[in-house]
């Protein structure tokens, strides 16, 4: 990191600082966020906010053209394939180094399973609730798995922000779980919630496997493999399960294109963030996706937003603010003491 380089600790002999005040360079060091805080901010702005548009846009494409989740997954995977050109230009193998190629493919498979579960859930469950269950389960599973497998714990304030954010998610999704309809519709809705939970579990496992990959081009390699594995698994099923469906109007094509671009941006930002910060904290910051999805659900879709949704969204926003703010304040305090 730039702030720890010896050059930044040398006194400036050409422009001496006044004896009564601290050097301006020390002030710059004091205010410079660490890699972990940068990762959390990237996850918040580049990962959570764009991902919040994906659920509503997917629902709009489904309502306009009856576009199933399998076709939407294939369209998204197509946006990952051009990354092969970047890998070729850099001279890197498309599938990664031979010794860790299996882990990279397994990570890509987990990503595809998470995406497929999310797209299936959003077609039978309100978009905000589907995002809530997926992000909540990914956060809890990431915290438990990282603690058990990597022995990497969290501070008290991190736990406070994480658990408070999960409380907000429970406030959002709780009333809907208690009022499931009886009969076939209720079964489909319950299965949608189960798919969202499994998607969060697959996401947390994928993040842990991703953190174990150590080679220069691991981010573009996993992104390309996610598209390749998704296509290899989805295209055969497309002709077995049902007749292929294409978007029927400009709105559907626009939604599909926007979903592909936004998910690729979100994937890249989350992939960067999880190498800098604790996976559970990254997943907690990604709860901002839920707030964005609820706002778009209210303004763009014929789906009501209950008072509990608004209350839970406020709790989520307050708690995901605690995590990067506390990390940044700790860094500043530590640098002042130095």
Curated annotation (Swiss-Prot):
Q: How does it sit in the membrane?
A: Multi-pass membrane protein
A single cellular component GO annotation:
membrane
* Keywords assigned: Membrane, Repeat, Transmembrane, Transmembrane helix
Localization recorded for this chain is: Membrane
Q: Name one Pfam family in it.
A: EamA
Chain positions covered by the region annotation Disordered? 1-28
Segments crossing the lipid bilayer: 37-57, 67-87, 105-125, 160-180, 190-210, 221-241, 250-270, 281-301, 310-330
- Ranges of residues in domain EamA: 49-174, 272-325
Q: Which InterPro entries match?
A: EamA_dom
Q: Which family does it belong to?
A: Belongs to the SLC35G solute transporter family.
More details = The gene encoding this protein appears to have arisen by SVA-mediated retrotransposition of the SLC35G6 gene in the primate lineage.
Q: What is this protein called?
A: Solute carrier family 35 member G5
Provenance organism: Gorilla gorilla gorilla (Western lowland gorilla)
């Amino acid at each position: 990191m730039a702030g720890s380089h010896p050059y930044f600790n040398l006194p400036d002999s050409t422009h001496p600082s006044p004896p009564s005040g601290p050097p301006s360079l020390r002030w710059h060091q004091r205010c410079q966020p660490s890699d972990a805080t940068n990762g959390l901010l990237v996850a918040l702005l580049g990962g959570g906010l764009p991902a919040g548009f994906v659920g509503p846009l997917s629902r709009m494409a489904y309502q306009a053209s009856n576009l199933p989740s399998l076709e939407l997954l294939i369209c998204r995977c197509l946006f990952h394939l051009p990354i092969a050109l970047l890998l070729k230009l850099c001279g890197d193998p498309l599938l990664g180094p031979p010794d860790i190629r299996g882990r990279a493919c397994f990570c890509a498979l987990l990503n595809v399973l998470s995406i497929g579960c999310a797209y299936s859930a959003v077609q039978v469950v309100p978009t905000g609730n589907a995002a809530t269950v997926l992000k909540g389960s990914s956060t809890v599973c990431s915290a438990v798995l990282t603690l058990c497998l990597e022995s990497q714990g969290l501070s008290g304030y991190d736990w406070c922000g994480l658990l408070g954010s999960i409380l907000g998610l429970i406030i959002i999704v709780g009333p809907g779980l208690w009022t499931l309809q009886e009969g076939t519709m209720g079964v489909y809705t319950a299965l949608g919630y189960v798919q969202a939970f499994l998607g969060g579990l697959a996401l947390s496992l994928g993040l842990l496997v991703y953190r174990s990959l150590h080679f220069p081009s691991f981010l573009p390699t996993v992104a390309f493999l996610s598209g390749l594995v998704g296509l290899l698994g989805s295209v055969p099923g497309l002709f077995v399960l049902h007749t292929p469906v294409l978007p029927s109007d400009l709105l559907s094509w626009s939604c599909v294109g926007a979903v592909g671009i936004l998910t690729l941006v979100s994937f890249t930002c989350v992939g960067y963030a999880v190498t800098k910060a604790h996976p559970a904290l990254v997943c907690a910051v990604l709860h901002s996706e839920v707030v964005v999805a609820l706002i778009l659900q209210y303004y763009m879709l014929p789906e009501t937003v209950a008072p509990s949704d608004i209350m839970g969204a406020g709790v989520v926003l307050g708690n995901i603010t605690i995590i990067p703010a506390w990390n940044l304040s700790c860094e500043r305090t530590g640098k002042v003491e130095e």
